UniProtKB/Swiss-Prot annotation:
HAMAP family: UPF0597. InterPro entries: Ser_deHydtase-like_asu (IPR005130), UPF0597 (IPR021144). This is UPF0597 protein YhaM. It holds the Pfam family SDH_alpha. Belongs to the UPF0597 family. GO terms for biological process: L-cysteine catabolic process to pyruvate. One of its GO terms (molecular function) is L-cysteine desulfhydrase activity.
Length: 436
């Protein structure tokens, strides 16, 4: 068995990827509220008549403008209503995967009747917080999710507390497979990818299957801003070259178009985000096809991409003012570099150049325009790699880029953790003023 060849560090890497790379149907912030609502509804015997919900400012930001799959509607209220009326509380981030047309119609009717209210949780010290309280006659149930999109910390009904999660976050961090990322390095991740038995990481090929299907759907339909299909038309008109760079741009954009436009296909997410999963997957797939990589080489490249993206994102808040498509694309740069020459120095140079390029991109909420940022990040990854292949990169003498890639990553993440907190507040204020 391959388990005997895997040391504890490598096993932690595999578990970290399995924990952070999961199928998700729909943008994960509204889906988190849908899950809370579905879990609350599951505690009641009668038909839910009314929903009150509270979310953190960051979750509100990422839920205001994004389409909920299968509904043609944007926002948190429809997500909460559909979670109650058609959600499967046991399905995690795929809570809405089996929602029927009748459930969608009933959810829209509940909204039209004014029976769904979504409010800001104030005060709120949690970046990711969603709470749904549902009512049926004199009975009610309330579910709270904190810290992670599926992390239910409390279930309560009118009869009393059903479940509460012990407050042992620090101990869990020590034992979590993600905890090992705080004291590892990109070099150790690369060594793992080069030597781990293929059978131990074969599962990552599911990312190519799911996100590849989303890309194809994005090119077929008119989803979201339809960036991918629009750019494909411009190729046919002779305004854009049909080359590898354009293929990366078009196919990655198309997957995000479908994702944000409400296609009823799951994305393989990364760090709680479908767009991050798409960004870490599709560029690597395109380059793998170009170089004729077999399944094993594709799996190793995808594992490097996804694990590098997780490694960087682990140094960030779960949600922040920094667009994390940029950090996911740093993972993609690593995966593409591995396919082309496999050298650590190439990977490090590509990531450093990306930090010198797209590090200022803000997250102004989940919406169709996320596909623009995904496409920009994917293109930046390819550009940075082309430079690195010629031993050219942004150096430690420039901006926030340091003389080694690990410090460059730390510098970028420190901006998001500290300085960009005020940026985040300003973004939320601007978006809230538009909603009134």
């Amino acid at each position: 068995m391959f388990e005997s060849k895997i040391n504890p560090l490598w096993q932690s890497f595999i578990l970290a990827v399995q924990e952070e790379v999961k199928p998700a149907l729909g943008c994960t912030e509204p889906i988190s509220l849908a899950l809370a609502a579905a879990a609350a509804a599951a505690e009641l015997d009668g038909t839910v008549e009314r929903i009150d919900a509270w979310v953190s400012p960051n979750l509100m930001k990422n839920g205001m403008g994004v389409t909920v799959p299968g509904t043609g509607m944007v926002g948190l209220p429809i997500a909460a209503a559909l979670g109650v009326l058609g959600g499967d509380a046991k399905a995690g981030l795929e809570v809405l995967k089996d929602a029927s047309a009748k459930a969608v119609a009933d959810a829209k009717a509940m909204l039209a009747a004014g029976h769904v209210a979504v409010m800001l949780q104030e005060p709120c010290n949690d970046i990711l917080f969603s709470r749904a309280k549902v009512y049926s006659g004199d009975s009610w149930a309330c579910v709270t999710i904190v810290g992670d999109h599926t992390n239910i910390v409390r279930i309560e009904t009118d009869k009393g507390v059903v479940f509460t999660q012990a407050d042992n976050a620090q101990e869990e961090e020590k034992t979590s497979p993600l905890g090992v990322l705080s004291h590892t390095s990109l070099e150790e991740i690369l060594a793992f990818v080069n030597a781990v038995p293929f059978d131990a990481i074969r599962f990552i090929l599911d990312a190519a299957r799911l996100n590849g299907a989303l890309s194809q759907e994005g090119l077929r339909g008119s989803w979201g801003l339809h960036i991918g299909s629009t750019l494909a038309k411009q190729c046919d008109r002779g305004l854009l070259a049909k080359d590898l760079s354009t293929a990366i741009l078009i196919r990655t954009s198309a997957a995000s178009d479908a994702r944000m436009g409400g296609a009823t296909l799951p994305a393989m997410s990364n760090s709680g985000s479908g767009n991050q999963g798409i960004t870490a997957t599709v560029p690597v797939m395109v380059v793998a096809e170009h170089v004729g990589a077999d399944d094993e080489r594709l799996a190793r490249a995808l594992m490097l991409s996804h694990l590098s993206a997780i490694y960087i994102h682990h140094q960030l808040p779960r949600l922040s003012a920094l667009c994390a498509a940029t950090t996911a694309a740093m993972g993609a740069a690593a995966g593409m570099a591995w396919l082309i020459d496999g050298r650590y120095d190439t990977i490090a140079m590509a990531i450093s150049s990306m930090i010198g390029d797209v590090s200022g991109m803000i997250c102004d909420g989940a919406s169709n325009s996320c596909a623009m940022k995904v496409s920009t990040s994917a293109s930046a990854a390819w550009k940075a790699l082309l430079m690195a292949l010629d031993d050219t990169a942004v150096t430690g003498n420039e901006g926030i880029v340091a003389h080694n890639v690990e410090q460059s990553i730390a510098n970028l993440c420190s901006l998001a953790c500290r300085s960009m907190q005020q940026t985040d507040k300003q973004i939320i204020e601007i978006m809230a003023s538009k909603a009134h």
